[in-house]
């Protein structure tokens, strides 16, 4: 059993890799962006003149929501995250990213590393986050039992 899953209701990965992989009680979430299933991006607006405006706060919030959706598919939640790595195209966006991050996590949340990268797989992306969660098998089975009872 590989434990790897591509989640149909989310944006398809832009390569041959899963959204998530479960190994024992650990859940590994691949780098996740603000991309929607229809291949548009949260946090991208084009004005009437054709100028593209990118919003780090909206993208950060959407990335974290996408990670929450991925974790939910394997019986986890954001509070199960133990480590995240955030990739920013520009450290000039750190303040806006950090502001949204702090709405959801505090010093008791996951450990975090934030790095600047040259670019991400699409020019509209300002941020991508990967993570590791600890979701004991007993919690995952309880979640599956609840879903099956519905």
Kindly give the residue locations of the regions a language model identified:
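N-terminal presequence-like segments and the immediate start of the first folded domain
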Residues: 1-65, 69-82, 88-150
């Amino acid at each position: 059993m590989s434990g790897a899953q591509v989640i149909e209701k989310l944006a398809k990965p832009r390569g041959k890799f899963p959204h998530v992989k479960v190994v024992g009680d650990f859940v590994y979430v691949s780098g996740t962006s603000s991309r929607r299933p229809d291949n548009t991006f949260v946090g991208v607006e084009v004005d009437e003149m054709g100028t593209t405006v990118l919003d780090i706060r909206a993208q950060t919030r959407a990335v974290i929501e996408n990670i929450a959706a991925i974790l939910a598919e394997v019986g986890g939640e954001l509070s199960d995250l133990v480590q995240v790595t955030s990739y920013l195209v520009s450290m000039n966006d750190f303040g806006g990213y950090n502001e949204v991050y702090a709405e959801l996590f505090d010093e008791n949340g996951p450990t975090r590393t934030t790095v600047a990268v040259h670019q991400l797989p699409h020019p509209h992306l300002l941020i991508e986050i990967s993570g590791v969660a600890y979701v004991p098998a007993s919690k995952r089975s309880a979640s599956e039992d609840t879903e099956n009872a519905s």
